[in-house]
């Protein structure tokens, strides 16, 4: 049985990845699961300088999901390279680093700095909807997506993935802009812009008012967008958004995703990624499927 997939030149032992921002730097989950079993670890978003993030509250539970407004809290790229990357190098798993810049120059600077041993890929975060400055403005403009991708590709030999925001009119146009800029793959979707209100105080739950919705509630939207993106580009698509079971993962792959990323479910069930991998294996056995690639893009549409 072959579970191996290739995403933009990156060979993964299986198609199951972690979604940035839900798995820390891998260390946090290392005591719960065997990290070597994962297809790839996508670490939480990094910025040039350390970032404290947004004031609390940062997380708010909703029916079938959650809103978050973390604000890209992270130690900065230098601290990651010095303190976190050595830990990840000890594992036999692809490491993809998510970067969030406030200017095109910052994206290029970080990508160049990460062109080092132990980093297998770079995910350009143009889509985080809970930060007042940075990503959001880039992610809604296809021209900006193209320009950032082009500049990042100039300075790195690593696999470059562009993470797209769902808060746009035509996801296919944005995916094509990333492809035209030289992206090796696109990943989608990031969180959907949402909000919550405290009816007693009549104030927003979050200081930033707008937050990012994730979890099972967004899965049908994510699935539709992955389907549209896969039809719009020739480069691989990584699907995510509300995946909490192997059945969810298979839906995304049948729709055209070459790999999938699991996010919010990690908070509820730290073993979710492993369960999805095992579930896919069982599905393949039951359906006499020898190669996972037979499933990808196999949707039958009349």
Swiss-Prot record:
GO terms for cellular component: cytoplasm. Its main location: cytoplasm. The active site is at residue 128. GO terms for biological process: 'de novo' pyrimidine nucleobase biosynthetic process; 'de novo' UMP biosynthetic process. Its EC number is 1.3.1.14. Keywords: Cytoplasm, Flavoprotein, FMN, NAD, Oxidoreductase, Pyrimidine biosynthesis. Catalyzes the conversion of dihydroorotate to orotate with NAD(+) as electron acceptor. It catalyses: (S)-dihydroorotate + NAD(+) = orotate + NADH + H(+). Heterotetramer of 2 PyrK and 2 PyrD type B subunits. Pfam families: DHO_dh. Binds 1 FMN per subunit. Its cofactor is FMN. Pathway: Pyrimidine metabolism; UMP biosynthesis via de novo pathway; orotate from (S)-dihydroorotate (NAD(+) route): step 1/1. This is Dihydroorotate dehydrogenase B (NAD(+)), catalytic subunit. The keyword Lipid metabolism does not apply. It is found in: Cytoplasm. Substrate binds at residues 44, 68-72, 125, 190-191. Belongs to the dihydroorotate dehydrogenase family. Type 1 subfamily. GO terms for molecular function: dihydroorotate dehydrogenase (NAD+) activity. It comes from Thermoanaerobacter pseudethanolicus (strain ATCC 33223 / 39E). The gene is pyrD. FMN binds at residues 20, 44-45, 98, 125, 163, 189, 215, 241-242, 263-264. It is an enzyme of class 1 (oxidoreductase).
């Amino acid at each position: 049985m072959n579970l191996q997939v290739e995403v933009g030149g990156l060979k993964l032992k299986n198609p199951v990845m972690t979604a940035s921002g839900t798995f820390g730097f891998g260390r946090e989950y290392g005591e719960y699961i065997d990290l070597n079993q994962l297809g790839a670890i996508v670490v939480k978003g990094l910025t040039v300088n350390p970032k404290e993030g947004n004031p609390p509250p940062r997380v708010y539970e909703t029916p079938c999901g959650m809103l978050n407004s973390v604000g890209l809290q992270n130690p900065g790229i230098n601290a990651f390279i010095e303190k976190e990357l050595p830990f990840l190098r000890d594992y036999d798993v692809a490491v993809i680093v998510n970067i969030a810049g406030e200017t095109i120059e910052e994206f290029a600077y970080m990508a160049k700095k990460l062109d080092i041993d132990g980093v297998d890929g770079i995910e350009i975060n143009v889509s985080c909807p809970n930060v007042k400055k940075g990503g959001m403005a880039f992610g809604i403009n296809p021209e900006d997506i193209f320009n950032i991708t082009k500049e990042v590709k100039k300075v790195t030999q690593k696999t470059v993935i562009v993470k797209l925001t769902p808060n746009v009119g035509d996801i296919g146009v944005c995916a094509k802009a990333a492809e035209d800029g030289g992206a090796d793959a696109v990943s989608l979707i990031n969180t959907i812009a949402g909000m919550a209100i405290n009816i007693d105080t009549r104030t927003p739950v979050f200081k930033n008012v707008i937050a990012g919705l994730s979890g099972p509630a967004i899965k049908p939207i994510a699935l539709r967008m992955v389907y549209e993106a896969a039809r719009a580009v020739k480069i691989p698509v990584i699907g995510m958004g509300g995946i909490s079971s192997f059945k969810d993962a298979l839906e995304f792959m049948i729709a055209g995703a070459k790999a999938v990323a699991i996010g919010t479910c990690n908070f509820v069930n730290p073993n979710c990624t492993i369960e999805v991998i095992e579930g896919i294996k069982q599905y393949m056995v039951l359906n006499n499927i020898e190669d996972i690639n037979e499933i990808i893009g196999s949707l039958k549409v009349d």
